[in-house]
Amino acid sequence: MESVETTTPSNSEIKSVETIVEEQKVNETNTTLNAEVVETPTKTEEKSKTEITNENKERSRGLEAKIKPEFVLPFKKIEKVEVDKAAKKKEFRNQLRESMNDKLCPKISKGLVCEFNETCKFSHDVEKYLASKPKSIGICQNFQTYGECKYGLNCYFGECHIVDNKTIVNKELIGKVEPVKTLNEVSNEIQIQLKTNNYPFPKSEIYFNENGISVRQIKGRNNNNNKNNNKQNDNKRKENEKDDDDDKLNKKIKLENENTTTTTTTTTTTTTETTEKTEKTEKTEKTETTETKKEEFKQSNENTEIDIMTPLKANEKKRINFENQLILAPLTTVGNLPFRRICKRLGADITIGEMALTTKLLEGTKSELALLKRHPCEDKFGVQICGSYVDAAVKCAEFIENEIDADFVDINSGCPIDLVCNMGAGAALMERPKKVEQLLRGISSSLSCPTTIKIRIGKSEDAPTAHKLIPSLGEWGACAVTLHGRSRAQRYSRLANWDYVKQCSEVSSIPLIGNGDIYNYQDVVNIYDSSKVSSIMIARGALIKPWIFTEIKEKREWDISASERLDFIRDFANYGLDHWGSDRIGVDNTRKFLLNWLSFSHRYIPVGLLDKVHYMNERPPAYFGRSDLETLLASTQVKDWIKITEMFLGPVTSDYSFVPKHNSNSYESQG
């Protein structure tokens, strides 16, 4: 972990939470009146291309942000603190995990009868549980709104509905307000089907047979249909993967199609050569018959084999507007549902769920399926999938088509993480255009909604390849492409190459969405005025200041007050409790994800403190804010972030620790 070269006031210098909030409310009016509003420059005031180029060169050096001298603190270097790598690996685990015997049975907590009785793995001792349970954090929002709390005695905000060791309900409120239901909840029955390899994929099977695509054995529990064929599947998979890696499979299909246009090749892992020949003959007869009927007269093919086999063309699919849209990027870990709700309120047009691995989705992994959840406020919502196996991707697309409510599906071909690239997925796909073609054609064939793809400029910034790939994406089935203006190798060590993004927008036949280092509305105005970029995707800029969507739409810089920022943090906490739950696990998850967000948001420098416009790669110097709360929100210390979470989620234990999931301090020297 990088050393932090900034200082913040000690705990003794920071006032209590109550005092901070009270003082901030008193100063709220003055803060708002003094807010700096920057209007859009007129044509005559716009900078020349030479001035913009020189400014971009200066920005690329990664200098410190320019803050008014009266707010800058004296420089004091803090010694580098080494972080135990093993501790970081374990960070994702719940640090306050209880043993099963210490957890109260969910049914007992609601006043119901548990059918397992003494064999139940949870505790049934209510008095013992309540005696060891921490003091209630506050008022339960669910009980106040809906008249009941589904977490019962397990609720950590249960002071208003836990009476005499029982949970009560308010009959007057029940039914008055309809609970907002999260979309894309996959039922237990479907999860079991996925885990046991019993989920049906009829469209995928037909597509595989028609295109000679090998099918891998999906990991799952004991399944009688597949158990006897595991060895045969493994042997054939190894052979087919070699062909697939060398792109020989594509050539084979083309040669066979030239010899006979009506015969289709069937390649499976569970049939013998004899049955393969029989199926080929039957398939040929079916294809010829349907083609003859098609010529003779028109008929409805709904719910027939033809209907299942025939994929929709891009222009026949559901329409979603990718022109002049502000899109929240699919942010792993931090782009969770509560954060997306914040961004929707502040002006994001389109939101995308966190990256989900195709193989994990097909295995029915609960945590992976949770990444597909959608809040009703997300009126334009996409899911992003990542994988390198064509068969898994096509099946995953069919599953999404059947079970998930999404307006489009995005293919991740831009993730630079080694763990993903070593699997041949993410940014590694750009080195294999044939694989990208197979994925796009296969996935789009299973979906009635648009398919999009997110890519980088290439493996190396010195030899970008995106301009060669982009012209073909529309033909392969993509309805839009997002281009992140960085290479796989550089990560965040340099600014995004927007000149190259603009060049690629000239050769794209489909809407091109630009992504990389968007941090103020001026950048967006310049991009739209000087290129054919259709829309803008925002990632880290939204994490640091989610109100960037408001700034872009209103074409102004928002000098947001500290109390307004604290309100967004409070809203995130409430949204988190609503999404993850108000029991112990839910509170811990909400705190963890809130801390991950604060590891980015502390980098924000209020507009009123700046001498000039702040850019993404400019490091904030040590400074103090216009109030104690503003100073606290700018702290780089984890202990202060934890203190902020305690305002809404209650105190942590004395041994609680937190290590950020991502390295948000990406200000490396740009020279």
Swiss-Prot record:
Keywords: Flavoprotein, FMN, Metal-binding, mRNA processing, NAD, NADP, Oxidoreductase, Repeat, tRNA processing, Zinc, Zinc-finger. The keyword RNA-binding does not apply. One of its GO terms (biological process) is mRNA processing. InterPro entries: Aldolase_TIM (IPR013785), DUS-like_FMN-bd (IPR035587), tRNA_hU_synthase_CS (IPR018517), Znf_CCCH (IPR000571). The active site is at residue 415. FMN binds at residues 330-332, 384, 454, 484, 515-517, 539-540. Its EC number is 1.3.1.89, 1.3.1.-. A zinc finger (C3H1-type) spans 99-127, 134-164. Residues 222-232, 258-273 have a biased composition (Low complexity). One of its GO terms (molecular function) is flavin adenine dinucleotide binding. It comes from the Eukaryota. It catalyses: 5,6-dihydrouridine(47) in tRNA + NAD(+) = uridine(47) in tRNA + NADH + H(+); 5,6-dihydrouridine(47) in tRNA + NADP(+) = uridine(47) in tRNA + NADPH + H(+); a 5,6-dihydrouridine in mRNA + NAD(+) = a uridine in mRNA + NADH + H(+); a 5,6-dihydrouridine in mRNA + NADP(+) = a uridine in mRNA + NADPH + H(+). It is an enzyme of class 1 (oxidoreductase). Residues 42-60, 248-257, 274-299 have a biased composition (Basic and acidic residues). Belongs to the Dus family. Dus3 subfamily. PANTHER family: TRNA-DIHYDROURIDINE(47) SYNTHASE [NAD(P)(+)]-LIKE. This is tRNA-dihydrouridine(47) synthase [NAD(P)(+)]-like. It comes from Dictyostelium discoideum. The gene is dus3l.
